[in-house]
Amino acid sequence: MALYLRLPATAGFNIDNELIIINAFNANEPEQSLHGKDVNIIASGPSIQQLPLSELLDTPTIFVNGSISLIGQHQFTDIAGYVISDARFISHQPEILQQYYKGQPLYATLAVFEAMATTHPDIMRTYHHAMRVLYPVDRPWGVKSNKLSFNKLIFKKKLLNKKMPLSYFINNP
């Protein structure tokens, strides 16, 4: 018999004695869906220089980590979201987030939001309504990611170490 645990629907972060609540990603929320549209996912790296970005400006686009800085050079008209999967990005390049993040949908891991609560508390206070927690499905719960812990969760460690099969997420976004 398989034990399926429900992922938390929210995560709370204490910022200057104020509890900031960020909802988890939920594909059933209408504003979280692209309704079957094509989408570009642009990450940062040397190959970005070879992309014909002028041809992609009107297509819904998801930016990953530092690629959001491209909105300073190009007029993207349909920003579908911004994904930060690496908490080190927050501490190594804080100016990118400060300069280019203006409330676009932001999807990030708990480790990223923990880093942001320390380095960018004002951004979290202002835009938490546009932020969504992404839970990793490729590793057991409780495994440390980017050297930041999930210690703010109030779940028992025993429950957090259960792997969730991908098939679970078909009916339970």
Feature locations, PLM:
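N-terminal pre-catalytic "stem/leader" segment of glycosyltransferase-like enzymes
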Residues: 1-35, 44
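Short, hydrophobic/glycine-enriched beta-strand segments
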Residues: 38-45, 60-64
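Short N-terminal binding/cap micro-motifs at the start of the first secondary-structure element
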Residues: 48-52
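Acidic/Gly/His-enriched mid-domain segments of enzyme catalytic cores or analogous surface patches
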Residues: 59-60, 66-172
